[in-house]
A protein has these predicted regions:
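N-terminal beta-strand motif that seeds the catalytic metal site of vicinal oxygen chelate
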Residues: 1-22, 85-88
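Vicinal oxygen chelate
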Residues: 1-4, 100-134
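Residue-level marker for the onset of beta-strands and adjacent loop->beta junctions
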Residues: 9, 42-43, 86, 99, ...
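Core segments of cupin and vicinal oxygen chelate
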Residues: 13-63
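Acidic/polar helix N-cap motif
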Residues: 17, 94-95
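Short amphipathic alpha-helices within nucleic acid-binding modules
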Residues: 24, 95-102
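Short, flexible, mixed-charge acidic loops at enzyme active sites
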Residues: 60-77
Length: 134
């Protein structure tokens, strides 16, 4: 049984261009910017998306962030082929094929084309800014 003392709070992304990245989530997924602050010398932008918080922040003095590895297709699956977070997922309540086409028309890149998942549901991988896979 899950521990009721814990709930999922946020995803935190480090970005080379935090305002551009935040605006991408607004334009592509309808996120809402709810705060834009400076934290420890770097922009820190809070977005609400699907009832959850996405935080995008800029480079802080002393950091040397490494670029994320791109997602790769393998025989029966796709992966960043690296330890750590592979992707985060949204559940889309609507016609995913139509939404996929809408995103493609806006210039979104898809490292893996639409495909059926193990449970029979449709999967759509999106390349987001900063090497993030959704």
């Amino acid at each position: 049984m899950s521990n009721p003392a814990f709930t999922f709070d946020h995803i935190h992304i480090i970005s080379q261009t935090p305002h551009e990245s935040a605006n991408w989530y607004v334009e592509m997924f309808g996120a809402e910017i709810v705060a834009d602050k400076i934290a420890y010398g770097a922009p820190q932008i809070f977005l609400e998306l699907g009832g959850k918080t996405l935080i995008i922040r800029g480079h802080r003095e002393g950091e040397t962030p490494m670029p994320a590895r791109p997602i790769q297709p393998f025989a029966r699956f796709s992966s960043h082929n690296a330890w750590g977070t592979d992707h985060f997922g949204f559940l889309y309540h609507g016609d995913l094929r139509a939404f996929h086409d809408e995103l493609r028309a806006k210039g979104v890149q898809f490292p893996v084309e639409l495909k059926q998942g193990n449970g029979g549901h449709l999967l759509c991988y999106v390349s987001a800014p900063d090497g993030v896979s959704i």
